[in-house]
Amino acid sequence: RFCGHRHGWFSDEIASALGLPSEVEQVDEMPKMVKALLGERYRLLKQSARSDSERVLLEQNIAALAERLQLNRVEMLILRLAVYMQIDPTLKEALNLIGRQIDRRRFCHLLAEMLNQPFAEIRAALHDKQKLMRFGLLQTNRHGRDFDDYLCWGDTLDADKLDIQPFSEETLLKRVVQPSMPAGLAWSDFEHTAAMACRIRDYLHHAYQTQRKGVNILLYGAPGTGKTEFASLLAHQLALSCYTLGSADEDEDMIGGQRRLQNVQLAQTLLAGQRALLVFDEVEDVFASSLFQLSAAQSHKAWVNQFLEHNAVPMVWISNDVGCMDEAFLRRFDIVLHMPDLPQQKKAALVEQLAHQRLSEGEVAYLAKQQKLTP
């Protein structure tokens, strides 16, 4: 298609990448000559002993990533093509010339031919519930119908970094979670809810001993009641590594509920088998619907329900309000705790501790009465 223009190439970049001389543009039977030249070039490439790629590091990283996430061969081949499309605009342009204004079925057929893989396996690998889409490695532009609209690069990984930095699981984990900050409160600071706190701690302890799946605790309550601190304390009490799912990316831009659901799935895969506790703060981003749009959780209701029954790494979910959550979701949590406000006496002691006795008794008392004052 790129040589069908009456005045020459549709794309000089593609012609150059294919090794076609500019003189061919002036030939009367240009399409016929181009087909012959490309056929010969393809034959020589197939016969050569050249390796699949000059990008050794990139190939190693793709293989390591596929192995860690247990991608099957078809998924790995699709991911590999998507990486090269992302870092090579000329390749993307060429593929769009081949697949322009096509439906999804035609796209899958083209991809199956390119990768020499069964159509059914290609279609299955690109399903929303499979790893490539589920982990946010790839995504689909629902408003376009060109080749690259069906094979968009996702938000989880930086394709350019795969080409210049060795892959590490630690780097991948940092893309979706951060180590939780050490708690600034002590276990004794939650004496006002001691019975429930001990119940949750003991329940989690038993869950780790028995390797139980589908363990989820929901903490909710007004800001300043110590929900996040309590989650960190639970991890400390049980000698667990604690990780928090971020609500912002590396550039401090807020990320949406759909991407956060992708991140939690990837984090579960990476942390499976470890003594870890996963904290999902500000879950309103995922569960809250608006008048005109369903929440990310409502849009994937069956999946969320299944996730809450089978997640391998125990989780603490934190919200200021559960009024936005469907009752069907609430019933899936093992324990739901409404976190009461810290007693004023306890708040006053914390204020004095943080202020290093530089405030008067009246100032301390005033601050302790502020419900929005966080620990």
Write out the residue ranges for each language-model feature.
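Hydrophobic/aromatic beta-strand patches that form the interior of the parallel beta-sheet core
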Residues: 217, 243, 316, 335-337
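Conserved AAA+ ATPase "SRH/arginine-finger" region at the nucleotide-binding site
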Residues: 319, 334-354
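Conserved AAA+ ATPase small/helical "lid" subdomain
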Residues: 348-351, 355-375
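Conserved catalytic/switch belt of AAA+ P-loop NTPases
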Residues: 283-335
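Intrinsically disordered, low-complexity N-terminal extensions of AAA+/P-loop NTPases
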Residues: 1-215, 222, 234-298
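Short acidic alpha-helix initiation/capping motifs at coil-to-helix transition points
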Residues: 52-60, 343, 357-359, 375
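Conserved lysine of the Walker
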Residues: 227
